[in-house]
């Protein structure tokens, strides 16, 4: 991927490439803080659509199988997928195969590199997109639904709604009160580590900021990198901003900032970057030239002691190493907002494009994806998330997954992630991706001028 050609309308030039990954509101109970990113996903034709040249290739459509209880839908559908890494790609293919076997509806899967998918989504949806596509809950969903680029699936929700909590339904609802999204799973952003390393070195789980830094000092003395970090893709640093802002200034301020109701020039925002400076000595150097996957390997390989990322980082571990992974919540910072236990816990799922060639087939696919059956099939191969559907079988959850469910359930303030909680043109490589990379590249720069530049960029968009 290369930088977008649109010039940066600021005095600070972003550092690095354009990509974003990923990715409910307070207590998963409202929709005001649910999210956005975007870019421009090269328009694909319907049918077996080819991936853009920057993408990750195309997955072959599975063959039809068996008699279909939904034979009235019939035919085939197309599915644009951002599950490009091997583990989720194979897990999604297993879901597609099960759907075809159950309904007789064939699915032509167009798999595109995850970051490319995000960056190209706007033009993709405005062109001739696939019938169905992977996407995200919250503002990102509402943004495109509000532009008329997604199909209202409220009729599907009238059938499957009892299989979801009210919070998941709220996260799937557009500004017009209609439903446009099927939640599939979610996952928390946490500090991941290897149990065997902590046992070998006698490390304790840090509860407070001072404990966290003291552990970092100990790890450095032991010849370890305390915190793995890779931000060449532009989005991982957003998680650090989110957690520091929520823990220092509270969930409401954070979501207000994402919505433009608070100012980037507020001294509260400067305090986030000042706190971040305290963390920098413990972070893996050269982050702007490292992918999140390579950073994960540093933690898995025990060159780094910890890694703050979504639990999907576990996809990078071998089956033999996976049981050795554990995590703990980001430490408290000693503020009035510690009790919120605010975290990012993004919801991933699916939508139907504005004018699918096979609307009934697309809706049948949504019905299937809304079942515990489909979600359990996915989680069998990708046990780094927790299912969204009420009827999902959680008895087979690993201790890792059980702990994920507990930490999500115990949080009183759940955000979706920076690039899902704000408008797409502000979150992208010309916006916060680039601005955060600029800070990482030059953390001692004048914060007053830096934050004014971010505010000026926001003001230029609204």
Q: Predicted regions: what is each one?
A:
Residues 136-189, 213, 240-242, 326-328, ...:
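Hinge/lid segment of periplasmic solute-binding proteins
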Residues 218, 258-288:
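Glycine-centered hinge/linker elements that transmit conformational signals in sensory
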